[in-house]
Structure formats: C-alpha cells, structure tokens
C-alpha cells in the first residue's frame, strides 16, 4: 500500500517480493494468474496500478512448495536483481519475510538499500521478532539506515465514531521504537471494510514521513 501511494503520486515504483517461500504480493495485487514476459534475456516485471512487480509466485505453480536451502535462495534473489528489467525507478520496495536469515543477507549484498522500514503488530510475539530484526539491521557488520517502524493491526475501528478497540494490545510498536531509538511512523487500524481507499489517509501520512527521511539521507550522502 505504500508503493500504491507513491505510484498514485506519480513516482516510478518497483515492488520486489523477496519472500521466496511464502510470496504474497501477487495475491494482494490480484496478479497471481499472470506470468512475466521476456525482453531478450531479461524478464519484464508485471505492471499493476503503475507498480512494476516481481515475485517467485509468478514463476512457479501455485501449489508448489519451494524447499530450498540458503544457496538457492541467494541465487533467486540475485536473479531478481540482475535478470529483471526494472527500468528507471524512483523507488524499489523490497518485501522481506519475517526473521533474520539468508534472504535478508542476500538482499543487503545485492541491493544498496537506502533504508529499512519495519512492520509489526502490537502483540508481544510479533514485537519480539521485530526486535531481533532491528538488532540485525543495526549490527555494525550490516549497518542499514533505519527509517522507522509501522504498527499494523493496531486497533479495531468498527465505524466512524472514533472508538478504538485494542484487540492485540496497545503500544507495542511505540515501546519498541523507544527502546531501539528509531522513529515510530504510524498505526494502521483494522477496519470492517479494509480497502486502500478507506485507509489512504493513514498510508499518505506514513509515506510522507518515509519520503522525508529518504530525502534527508540522500542529502547527507
């Protein structure tokens, strides 16, 4: 949805689904039945809503499980970076799986990242996993710019009367940011009709903060 917000604003946006074992971007964008075409020796991304997308889900059968070890995962990430005709982009979002493993290290190796945006939900199990991800990205041997953290499914808002129900607990994301010294970018609520349109204000606010931080980082490089 952050990619959608930037594309709607006129930016040239790419979205790489780096979750090799559990790719979800094609399902979220309703492109799971499409297949990439070739342009010479390069694959052409699947374009949807102004976003150039690539995912392992485009390349394998829907029910096929990829039981791959680290070297195969790293090779797949390398090919997504070098064998896809991304073209000239303003932003490339990389959707990573949870955890701290080979895929994350491969992305850092193959793509010069401008920064990292973390997403968590409020409950302690998710916050604990996100805490480990922060530790990885702040490791001196990896050292990535931390843009900040988004808390998804922060509260349930059944209607427009403003009343909020904190189903999964309250404040986990903010507390984690305070501990780690990173910025809290905002909350995404659960709504009965959770569409891009009725959450667009949330995404615009968060995207604005991300773009501002990226601009500051670029100016300081």
Region roles according to the model:
Residues 22, 70, 74-78, 124-131, ...:
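Amphipathic alpha-helical transducer elements in NTP-driven molecular machines
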Residues 36-38, 56-72, 78-106:
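Switch II (G3) loop of P-loop NTPases
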Residues 6-63, 74, 81:
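Phosphate-binding loop that captures ATP/GTP phosphates
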Residues 8, 78, 82-86, 139-142, ...:
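Generic secondary-structure signature for well-ordered alpha-helical cores
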Residues 17, 47, 55-58, 96, ...:
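Flexible glycine-/small-residue-rich
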Residues 3, 7, 108:
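Gly/Ala-rich phosphate-binding loop of Rossmann-like dinucleotide-binding domains
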Residues 179-182, 189-221:
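NTP-binding/hydrolysis catalytic cores, primarily Walker-type P-loop NTPases
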Residues 90-91, 97-187, 193-196:
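Conserved catalytic-core segment of NTP-binding enzymes
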